[in-house]
């Protein structure tokens, strides 16, 4: 019985000693993060899609902050993210990267043909924002509110039942260009 208590005490002391060493090392060798990188990373949509040319949102945020990379390369975030980053960095907003377009292209979402879905879950594993729901050997569906249109779920699908489709424009989602609407100013007469 004494041998068991000695072993328990020895393991506890070793755990305490190694914990103290690790605690000291974590404070002694801590690396300070750039607060600007943290703020940019919080603004980005965290879809980790790679459409900006970087493997994820964090590396893109680091190159924006440290190397002066363009702020207009995040396709899933679109114009809203670019404007927030421009405001944070006090730089001029830039047109979205890609083909020159006056308006932002329509938002795309993944759509699954549920009749052909075999429930392999490969699309669920590929989705960086967990916008696809379903179970093994059961049909899957996409929650369009969460889908960023990053296209990462299309290629892994063995039955090719996933496609990207534009979101239907409604009066709420339409981007009204109010500068093109002709306005006539009518003078108002004041009577005393």
Curated annotation (Swiss-Prot):
Species annotation: Escherichia coli O6:K15:H31 (strain 536 / UPEC)
One annotated GO molecular function: electron transfer activity
Pfam family, one: Fer4_21
Function as written in the Swiss-Prot or TrEMBL entry: Part of a membrane-bound complex that couples electron transfer with translocation of ions across the membrane. Required to maintain the reduced state of SoxR.
Name of the gene this protein is made from: rsxB
EC numbers for this chain: 7.-.-.-
Region (Hydrophobic), start-end ranges: 1-26
One GO cellular component term: plasma membrane
Record's signal peptide: none
Binding sites annotated in the UniProt record for [4Fe-4S] cluster 2: 117, 120, 123, 157
Protein name, UniProt field: Ion-translocating oxidoreductase complex subunit B
PROSITE patterns: 4FE4S, 4FE4S_FER_1, 4FE4S_FER_2
Binding site for [4Fe-4S] cluster 3: 127, 147, 150, 153
Cofactors, names only: [4Fe-4S] cluster
